[in-house]
């Protein structure tokens, strides 16, 4: 009779051990990440990143963004150019330069005499810009329209001579190209291209956030007023401390982080997030300058 309570007591203890042992093992095998985030404005002192959400991801945010590109690829510039109502020569020029920007000093400086003579839109704008200089050094045509049918060989030779003279004049007087872009405003497709690029970037960032949260999120934590945060009970592995869809701002500085950290069983990894290990805001597929 005295052995039964002892047996029951032993069975109870064994039962509790069986219940608690997995919890104990899990606690011993998991790790922890403590981090502090601070931003230093230019010429200023470090400031804590207060009450912002940080994410512990099982994949680098940059790699996740690359994965998202499979779902939201950048717009095709050549396809965009094919849809424009411009000359074939203009389309060829845009594809060769990989640019649809037809305004600004950099654009006009990039134009060669061959570009201006060979692309009808450039030639028309150039001639319109320089028509006032005829008689003061600018070439004048010798060919006559009546010769186009009456004497086509003479017409062709004199027109080619005139074009060659203009080509030579452009090379000798490069400043004559200045202001050409003012007559290209109605043809400039740059703004339409920018809209496409901006829309793709928005969709790409949306897909990146979706993948990060649905496939690769291990933990998340908010920083306190001192910029401290922690991820507890994390399985041993390599992770990345990241910000998703937000930036840490201080003065003229805007940062986010995608910092790797290794979590070991039963240990606490400590990470200092600062300007030194931050990355610049994403500028993936920066086609807006084309």
Question: Where in the sequence are the language-model features?
Answer:
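Charged interaction patches that mediate protein-protein contacts
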Residues: 1, 15, 286-290
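Bacterial N-terminal signal peptides
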Residues: 11-23
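N-terminal targeting/docking segments
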Residues: 2, 25-26
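Long luminal/extracellular ectodomains of secretory-pathway precursor proteins
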Residues: 28-290
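Bacterial N-terminal signal peptides that target proteins for export
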Residues: 2-13
């Amino acid at each position: 009779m005295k052995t039964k309570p002892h047996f029951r007591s032993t069975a109870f203890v064994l039962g509790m051990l069986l219940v608690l042992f997995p919890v104990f093992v899990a606690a011993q095998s998991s790790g922890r990440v403590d981090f502090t985030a601070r931003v230093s404005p230019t010429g200023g002192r470090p400031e804590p990143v207060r009450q912002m959400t940080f994410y512990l991801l099982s994949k680098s945010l940059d790699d996740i963004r690359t994965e998202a590109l499979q779902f939201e690829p950048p717009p095709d510039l050549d396809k965009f150019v094919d849809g424009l109502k411009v000359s074939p020569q203009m389309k060829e020029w845009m594809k060769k330069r990989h640019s649809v920007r037809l305004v600004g000093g950099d654009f006009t400086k990039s134009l060669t005499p061959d570009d201006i003579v060979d692309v009808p839109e450039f030639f028309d704008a150039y001639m319109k810009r320089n028509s006032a200089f005829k008689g003061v050094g600018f070439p004048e045509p010798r060919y006559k329209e009546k010769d186009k049918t009456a004497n086509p060989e003479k017409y062709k030779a004199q027109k080619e001579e005139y074009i060659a003279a203009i080509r030579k004049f452009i090379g000798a007087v490069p400043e004559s190209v200045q202001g050409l872009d003012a007559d290209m405003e109605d043809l400039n497709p740059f703004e339409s291209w920018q809209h496409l690029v901006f829309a793709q970037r928005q969709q790409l960032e949306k897909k990146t956030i979706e993948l990060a949260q649905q496939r690769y999120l291990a933990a998340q934590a908010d920083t306190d007023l001192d910029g401290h945060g922690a991820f507890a009970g994390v399985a041993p592995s390599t992770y990345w401390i990241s910000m998703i869809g937000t930036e840490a701002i201080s003065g003229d500085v805007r940062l986010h982080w995608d910092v790797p950290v290794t979590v070991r069983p039963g240990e606490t990894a400590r990470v200092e997030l600062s300007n030194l290990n931050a990355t610049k805001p994403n500028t993936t597929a920066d086609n807006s300058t084309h």
